[in-house]
Amino acid sequence: MGARSSVLSGKKADELEKVRLRPGGKKKYMLKHVVWAANELDRFGLAESLLESKEGCQKILTVLEPLVPTGSENLKSLFNTVCVIWCIHAEEKVKHTEEAKQVVKRHLVVETGTADKMPATSRPTAPPSGRGGNYPVQQVGGNYVHLPLSPRTLNAWVKLVEEKKFGAEVVSGFQALSEGCTPYDINQMLNCVGEHQAAMQIIREIINEEAADWDVQHPQPGPLPAGQLREPSGSDIAGTTSTVEEQIQWMHRQQNPIPVGNIYRRWIQLGLQKCVRMYNPVNILDIKQGPKEPFQSYVDRFYKSLRAEQADPAVKNWMTQTPLIQNANPDCKLVLKGLGMNPTLEEMLTACQGVGGPGQKARLMAEALKEAFQPGPLPFAAAQQQGRRTVKCWNCGKEGHTAKQCKAPRRQGCWKCGKPGHQMAKCPERQVGFLGFGPWGKKPRNFPMAQIPQGLTPTAPPEMPTAPPVDPAADLLRSYMQLGKKQRESRKTPYKEVTEDLVHLNSLFG
């Protein structure tokens, strides 16, 4: 380990430990990373001593660079580590791995000068964008050469179809991946799709319809002289009756070029758009925001469906103003209507941020509790009665405090009449209750008794005694009681008579 760690020593080792592994990360390079890189070089047949100099690191990078795009994670990590070591040897100040990679690529292009050493006639150049695509057709030595699509492009297209399931993203993805392709390359992309053969059949039908329309609009002229390039037909544009060389000549000829690649791409885009409508049958007017769904996710779903809609820009603009607001939930709709006429999407997203979340629910709950605990308006009579109600002290007779809070001397005797010997609860001058003074000594009354002041005599004549009214129920009860008493007396037999009868039975047993 000591020999391998001596690749960088002293000041260079200190500079290595200042470089971060990732931009903005906390971890930094250490000597163990150099030891690991030296061990990995054996797998590629490279000597460890190459890491000790700038030129040696450059040789390692020239070997590893072509393998990085399709290499494993270990290969990419080895390439990054060697880039950092190269920067240390070259005394380039770098802060992290990505910056070291950029510095290495910039210096290697300048030092090698591979582009300058090539002759101008054989240097790959792309044709102007106005005359067709720039890939995979390239101009080498004054002639246009066809380069097949890379496996990475085909793999990206297949993954796009498998993951998105013919969503709205497939159309734009196809446009990006098929830029500058010939009909031969586009057919190769379509043939790579193994699944979704129903969608592929729909695309073929659209291609046949468009090819038939092309033949009607561009009829073929009569017989041409030998060696002259014919005009493309619908099947030629679809790549079924034409070769790659003919397609390139139609695209890049000097007089009357025909971009057969772009025409074929347009036909396939029509088929893809039809597949998108078939695989996404949801109408944009049916997309509504859920009661607990954030407004941002609702807008994402809305615009994703709008992207799949094939409508005029004016209709799409109307959809972004009217249905977007109408299909929002009541909380967001209340906020959006307060923004005025034709608010922008940024204003709507900013205004509805946090609507339906915990913060808004807490505010609504606080407002509801505040309204619930706030006393309502009292009736007029109750308000007057409540305003007249005051506290009166029994000790001093003043208002505003109770007897317990009174600071005046304690008054002796009854607080009602002021006489000693009894309390206010037993005061004879208190107001008579509904049942009279109480049950002691006499039965309770069911009417209030008026107190007759002493010294006053009644002036009305006394009532004459009269017989009580006859109650038939009382007479019947009295007769039953007398009858029962007689029956009890008749059933009673003296004990002496019973014992005598028992004694006389002894003669039966002799």
Curated annotation (Swiss-Prot):
A lipid is attached at residue 2 (N-myristoyl glycine). This is Gag polyprotein. The keyword Chaperone does not apply. Keywords: Capsid protein, Host cell membrane, Host cytoplasm, Host membrane, Host nucleus, Host-virus interaction, Lipoprotein, Membrane, Metal-binding, Myristate, Phosphoprotein, Repeat, RNA-binding, Viral budding, Viral budding via the host ESCRT complexes, Viral nucleoprotein, Viral release from host cell, Virion, Zinc, Zinc-finger. Matrix protein p17 targets Gag and Gag-Pol polyproteins to the plasma membrane via a multipartite membrane binding signal, that includes its myristoylated N-terminus. Also mediates nuclear localization of the preintegration complex. Implicated in the release from host cell mediated by Vpu. Capsid protein p24 forms the conical core of the virus that encapsulates the genomic RNA-nucleocapsid complex. It holds the Pfam family Gag_p24_C. A motif (PTAP/PSAP motif) lies at residues 458-461. GO terms for biological process: viral budding via host ESCRT complex; viral translational frameshifting. It comes from the Viruses. GO terms for cellular component: host cell cytoplasm; host cell nucleus; host cell plasma membrane; membrane; viral nucleocapsid. SMART domains: ZnF_C2HC (SM00343).
